[in-house]
Design a protein with these regions (language model features):
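C-terminal helical "lid" subdomain and adjoining coupling/linker elements of P-loop NTPases
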Residues: 261-283
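AAA+ P-loop NTPase catalytic core and its hallmark functional loops
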Residues: 1-248, 256
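Amphipathic alpha-helical interaction segments
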Residues: 62, 253-256, 274-281
Length: 283
């Protein structure tokens, strides 16, 4: 359904800016000397850490550049490669609040920008402005992830284009106000296709992202499926009781089968594939 902003802890606007530095090698297990800003304490809307998560080197670097230098980063990859989870797990370790909005659902312009609500105050009906998810996020230390970016409706994309343009400033004409982004607001997106539309016809409902939209993303990175070894490792980490000689071979075979479905999907012979999530529930 449409994004529900009521369950966000929006009642307090945090005056927080990053107050901790994290070492990329220690925090994400990737081989690079890099210190990245984050928060020392948990804030509302920080994702939970999955200790077994395996970070992809290039995707992690791209997303960390987004967090450290306020770059707009888009992660592209086939269904099931775990694009949004990757961003969330980085945010979790930086203790950076992170919110995902799936653009292929029924998200409207009003959901993003906000609307006037009629409320009762001291027995009188008055109209009061309620921020939408985008207007709220812009004013907070939040990493906002637009999922399925290539499936967004034109009216919604038009709104997003506005914040990609003017240094992130957003003008609300009805409200007669300009929202300037919080210094720790970050913007990410995930897409199934590299903005080229979908030549295979696999992704129903994906629009071609126009070049103007693509150029405004500072970094576009591609996340592919894991190698058989890495994916097997993840499954064994998540289900330790399978970590014995006999079951190990079985899990590796399951992963190989899943890989075949992905190859078939890429070449257009199959219309569905087994994502790592599917293999995990099968195991």
């Amino acid at each position: 359904g449409a994004f529900d902003t009521t369950n966000l802890e929006t009642n307090r606007v945090h005056s927080t800016i990053p107050d901790a530095m994290y070492d990329a090698r220690e925090t994400f297990g990737i081989d690079i000397d890099l210190k990245v800003p984050g928060f020392a304490h948990d804030l509302p809307n920080v994702p939970e850490i999955d200790d077994t998560y395996q970070f992809d080197h290039d995707t992690t670097l791209a997303v960390l550049a987004g967090f450290a230098h306020n770059r707009r980063v888009m992660v592209q990859g086939l269904h099931g490669t775990g694009k949004s989870t990757h961003i969330e797990q980085i945010a979790a370790r930086l203790k950076w609040p992170c919110i995902r909005i799936n653009l292929d659902s029924h998200v409207s312009r009003i959901d993003l920008l906000g609307k006037d609500l009629i409320v009762l105050k001291e027995g009188k009906q008055i109209t009061e402005w309620k921020d939408g998810i985008l207007t709220w996020a812009l004013q907070n230390p939040v990493a906002l992830v637009f999922d399925e970016y290539d499936a967004g409706r034109p009216d919604v994309m038009f709104v997003i284009q506005r914040i990609l343009e003017a240094e992130g400033k957003l003008t609300l004409l009805d409200q007669n106000k300009i929202i300037r982004p919080h210094p720790a607001f970050r913007l990410f997106a995930t897409a199934n296709t590299i903005g080229l539309g979908d030549t295979t016809g696999l992704y129903h409902g994906t629009q071609q992202i126009n070049q103007g939209q693509m150029d405004r993303w500072n970094i576009v990175t591609v996340l592919n499926y894991l190698s058989v070894e890495d994916e097997t490792k993840i499954i064994l980490a998540k289900i330790p009781e399978l970590n014995n000689a006999e079951s190990k071979d079985e899990v590796a075979s399951m992963v190989q089968l899943a890989n075949l479905t992905r190859q078939g999907f890429r070449s257009g012979d199959l219309s569905t594939l087994m994502s790592p999530r599917t293999v995990l529930s099968w195991a």
